[in-house]
Amino acid sequence: MVAFLSAWPWENFGNLKYLLYAPLAAQVVYSWVYEEDISKVLWCIHILIICGLKALVHELWSVFNNMLFVTRTLRINPKGIDFKQIDHEWHWDNYIILQAIIVSLICYMSPPLMMMINSLPLWNTKGLIALIVLHVTFSEPLYYFLHRSFHRNNYFFTHYHSFHHSSPVPHPMTAGNATLLENIILCVVAGVPLIGCCLFGVGSLSAIYGYAVMFDFMRCLGHCNVEIFSHKLFEILPVLRYLIYTPTYHSLHHQEMGTNFCLFMPLFDVLGDTQNPNSWELQKKIRLSAGERKRVPEFVFLAHGVDVMSAMHAPFVFRSFASMPYTTRIFLLPMWPFTFCVMLGMWAWSKTFLFSFYTLRNNLCQTWGVPRFGFQYFLPFATKGINDQIEAAILRADKIGVKVISLAALNKNEALNGGGTLFVNKHPDLRVRVVHGNTLTAAVILYEIPKDVNEVFLTGATSKLGRAIALYLCRRGVRVLMLTLSMERFQKIQKEAPVEFQNNLVQVTKYNAAQHCKTWIVGKWLTPREQSWAPAGTHFHQFVVPPILKFRRNCTYGDLAAMKLPKDVEGLGTCEYTMERGVVHACHAGGVVHMLEGWKHHEVGAIDVDRIDLVWEAAMKYGLSAVSSLTN
């Protein structure tokens, strides 16, 4: 049975919970449109604005927290936040709705207070002093006492406070993630100083806005998992150790739970003899080690941006959005101009940066981002700059001791760098293994084709992947219709096949040659007209970037080749572009397998057809699994 006040009344509403703000918004709109006077509903406007500011504070702290390229050396808990924690904290903003409802009810039940709020001055120095006094003498001790009680009483901790502590890695969103009862108590803790100021006649809008926003700001600070304070600050002014907590201070509370119960002021932990003795030493240690090299990743996936809209799928933009497969969202459109400007800035000044990470069997796996977008790879004058970025990333990985670096999508474009061959030839003494991952990509596509298929139509047939697929299938006795206008390139591939299988490779120059073939392997973009040649019931396997559009309703379409990471992956909380949770592109998975196997060779240039089955079996051995890509 659910404990009293442990669940939220709108728990099953989903995003419809935001309609609870509607009465306030409706009140404002009605007064503005029909009464042409909003002075009587200023309190509604203030509530809505403050709620928006509170949400913005959490979002900005989340952005900062997830900027690993800025915060990685100052992180307190080095673990990553996984999908389970993100889902657990999905409705972290319930408390903001609760506060809006409580304040609205108070205003409705107390018309004098409502009128007082509508006529508050912008600033009152006495009110600021009263606010500080009330916070220190009421809010801090009340919170400390109740927080400690929730920990020491087994019933209250088990049924209430454990919900907050079930997030293994502190995050700004963790700050608001608690039960209904705890947030009602927090409303009292944060509300009494504000109500007190108003009742004393010294309230002001600055006090209300400032305290409401700073209260959440400080809560996010304590949960941000990034030590932002310099240890020198507390050495120069030791008194600050009693007046303000640090992210390290509160992280120790989440790790050990029996100490550091204060709201914002460690003074009350000192008075209650509950301060963790390592609080300030650990804080100093983290700050001093900020310039030192942290753990070196065993594997790096070198990715790049696709387009401006998908750039907002980054975890340091909206964490919840990044934890779901990418789709274009209307609410992101207003951010497009700003993101476009950021893209231009990245083009001019940015270097390869840490994007995300996870751990697999004690191997640290990171994704680094090349600050370039898809269209830039097709600009002739941008080629050198892109290769310089990729080369710098490879050399950096080699210098710090990375074992394997895998090139994503366009970073291994044949015309750009020969599938990574350029870098391996230029730096023959590389210790890091450079991998394009296309061997596993080919394996995923090939193992998806039913065994009873005896004919396929292949576009992009003379590309690196197309060549490998054609040679593999012809050995299997499958007739491969290779779409290419180049007789020379076709014959070159045909000669690589064993003599007895060469007749299985057939050159075709037009799409109508495949009008009776129901298995299409697409390595080149198809227009609706070109797709129309496929007979009903055709399945389009594909390795073209970006994927072809699904025009045919009587056909099925495969997604890009992908694999699901093993179940024991830890700290994974970001979806890779349009992939489902825990699923990565096959070239990414290929690099992981290369690292796990400890292979010492570079996988660049042409795909070794003889290794396709070997790489597939290795992937299966480590628990990676093929992803069914059959979609209508």
Swiss-Prot record:
Can the keyword Transmembrane be found in this entry's annotation?
Answer: yes
Q: How does it sit in the membrane?
A: Multi-pass membrane protein
Compartment list = Endoplasmic reticulum membrane
EC number of this enzyme: 4.1.99.5
Looking at the UniProt record for this protein, which Gene Ontology cellular component terms does it annotate, in alphabetical order?
endoplasmic reticulum membrane; membrane; plasma membrane
Asked if the record carries the keyword Transmembrane helix, the reply is yes
InterPro entries associated with the record? CER1-like_C, Fatty_acid_hydroxylase, NAD(P)-bd_dom_sf, Sterol_Desaturase_Related
Q: Which GO terms describe its biological process?
A: alkane biosynthetic process; cuticle hydrocarbon biosynthetic process; pollen sperm cell differentiation; wax biosynthetic process
Q: Which domain of life is it from?
A: Eukaryota
Query: What UniProt keywords apply to this chain's record, in alphabetical order?
Result: Endoplasmic reticulum, Lyase, Membrane, NADP, Transmembrane, Transmembrane helix
Q: The Fatty acid hydroxylase domain covers which part of the protein? A: 133-274
Kindly list the GO molecular function terms attached to this UniProt entry: aldehyde oxygenase (deformylating) activity; iron ion binding; oxidoreductase activity
- Spans traversing the lipid bilayer: 13-33, 41-61, 96-116, 127-147, 184-204, 298-318, 330-350
Where does the entry say this protein is expressed, by tissue?
Expressed in siliques, stems, flowers and weakly in leaves. Not detected in pollen, seeds and roots, but expressed in lateral root primordia. Specifically found in the L1 layer of the shoot apical meristem and in developing trichomes.
The UniProt entry, under Pfam families, shows: CER1-like_C, FA_hydroxylase
Task: Say what happens when this gene is deleted.
Answer: Plants show postgenital fusion between aerial organs and severe male sterility in low-humidity environments. Altered cuticular waxes, but no effect on cutin load and composition.
Reactions catalysed:
a long-chain fatty aldehyde + 2 NADPH + O2 + H(+) = a long-chain alkane + formate + 2 NADP(+) + H2O
Subunit structure, briefly? Interacts with CER1.
Biological function: Involved in cuticule membrane and wax production, and in the typhine and sporopollenin biosynthesis of pollen. Core components of a very-long-chain alkane synthesis complex. May be the fatty acid reductase responsible for aldehyde formation.
Q: Which family does it belong to?
A: Belongs to the sterol desaturase family.
List the protein's name: Very-long-chain aldehyde decarbonylase CER3
> Top-down, what is the taxonomic lineage of the species of origin?
Eukaryota, Viridiplantae, Streptophyta, Embryophyta, Tracheophyta
